[in-house]
Curated annotation (Swiss-Prot):
<dbReference type="GO" id="GO:0009117">
    <property type="term" value="P:nucleotide metabolic process"/>
</dbReference>
<keyword id="KW-0378">Hydrolase</keyword>
<dbReference type="GO" id="GO:0017111">
    <property type="term" value="F:ribonucleoside triphosphate phosphatase activity"/>
</dbReference>
<feature type="active site" description="Proton acceptor">
    <location>
        <position position="68"/>
    </location>
</feature>
<dbReference type="GO" id="GO:0036222">
    <property type="term" value="F:XTP diphosphatase activity"/>
</dbReference>
<dbReference type="Pfam" id="PF01725">
    <property type="entry name" value="Ham1p_like"/>
</dbReference>
<dbReference type="GO" id="GO:0005829">
    <property type="term" value="C:cytosol"/>
</dbReference>
<dbReference type="GO" id="GO:0035870">
    <property type="term" value="F:dITP diphosphatase activity"/>
</dbReference>
<comment type="function">
    <text>Pyrophosphatase that catalyzes the hydrolysis of nucleoside triphosphates to their monophosphate derivatives, with a high preference for the non-canonical purine nucleotides XTP (xanthosine triphosphate), dITP (deoxyinosine triphosphate) and ITP. Seems to function as a house-cleaning enzyme that removes non-canonical purine nucleotides from the nucleotide pool, thus preventing their incorporation into DNA/RNA and avoiding chromosomal lesions.</text>
</comment>
<keyword id="KW-0547">Nucleotide-binding</keyword>
<dbReference type="GO" id="GO:0000166">
    <property type="term" value="F:nucleotide binding"/>
</dbReference>
<dbReference type="InterPro" id="IPR020922">
    <property type="entry name" value="dITP/XTP_pyrophosphatase"/>
</dbReference>
<feature type="binding site">
    <location>
        <position position="172"/>
    </location>
    <ligand>
        <name>substrate</name>
    </ligand>
</feature>
<feature type="binding site">
    <location>
        <position position="68"/>
    </location>
    <ligand>
        <name>Mg(2+)</name>
    </ligand>
</feature>
<keyword id="KW-0546">Nucleotide metabolism</keyword>
<feature type="binding site">
    <location>
        <position position="39"/>
    </location>
    <ligand>
        <name>Mg(2+)</name>
    </ligand>
</feature>
<feature type="binding site">
    <location>
        <position position="69"/>
    </location>
    <ligand>
        <name>substrate</name>
    </ligand>
</feature>
Length: 195
C-alpha cells in the first residue's frame, strides 16, 4: 500500500490522519519537499484544500492529500472561517486567535459554532476529489483541556460534555470534523482497492 502524503507541516493534522490510518505510513510533505507552501487564496475551505493538494501532486508527481479547515461561529456570520489560522493576523498563534475570538464573543449569547474540514485528494491526470466533515459545538468563555490544537480548548461538544481539547485522540478521530472527513476518505480509498 502506498504512503499517504499529507500536504501540511502541521503535526496536529498529521497526527489526526495517523490516528485513523493506523496501518499505513502517513508522512507530511516536509519529508519530501523542503519549504513547501501554498498561498491560501480561496474563498472557501474546498478551494484552499484543492489549491494545496493540486500544487503538491504536481510538485511530487504522485497522489497527495490536503485539507483546509476552520471554525465557523454563527453569531459572527461564519467568522473566522477560512481565516481561522490567521484570525488575529499574520504571525500570530493559536492563543492570539482564541483571545481575539473570545473578545469578539464577549457579550454574545448565541455561541453556537461548527468546525469544518474539507479534504482534497489530487493525483497527476486525475480529477481532484473532496470529502467534507463537520462537528457542531458551542464556544466556551474560557479554555479547558490540553489535548489538541487551534480552537480545541474553547470548542465544547455537548454530546461529550467536554471540549475538543479534553478528549483523547481516538475519541477525536471518531467525532471531529477532520476525523469525519478522513473516515470518508478512508472509505473511498478502501473501495478503490476492491475495484
Amino acid at each position: 500500500m502506498e504512503d499517504i502524503v499529507i500536504a501540511t507541516n502541521n503535526q496536529g493534522k498529521i497526527n489526526d490522519f495517523k490516528a485513523i490510518f493506523k496501518n499505513q505510513n502517513v508522512i507530511g510533505i516536509s519529508e519530501l519537499i523542503e519549504d513547501f507552501d501554498v498561498e491560501e487564496t480561496g474563498a472557501t475551505f474546498e478551494e484552499n484544500a484543492k489549491l494545496k493538494s493540486e500544487a503538491a501532486a504536481h510538485a511530487l508527481n504522485k497522489r497527495v492529500i490536503a485539507d483546509d479547515s476552520g471554525l465557523e461561529v454563527f453569531a459572527l456570520n461564519g467568522e473566522p472561517g477560512v481565516y481561522s489560522a490567521r484570525y488575529a493576523g499574520l504571525g500570530k498563534n493559536d492563543e492570539d486567535n482564541i483571545e481575539k475570538l473570545l473578545t469578539n464573543l464577549e457579550d454574545v449569547q448565541d455561541r453556537r459554532a461548527q468546525f469544518v474540514c474539507v479534504i482534497s485528494m489530487s493525483a497527476p491526470n486525475e480529477k481532484t476529489k473532496t470529502f467534507k466533515g463537520t462537528v457542531s459545538g458551542v464556544i466556551t468563555t474560557e479554555r479547558h483541556g490540553k489535548n489538541g490544537f487551534g480552537y480545541d480548548p474553547i470548542f465544547f461538544v455537548p454530546e461529550l460534555n467536554k471540549t475538543m481539547a479534553e478528549i483523547t485522540n481516538d475519541e477525536k478521530g471518531k467525532i471531529s470534523h477532520r476525523g469525519n472527513a478522513i473516515l470518508l476518505l478512508k472509505e473511498y480509498l478502501e473501495g478503490e482497492q476492491h475495484v
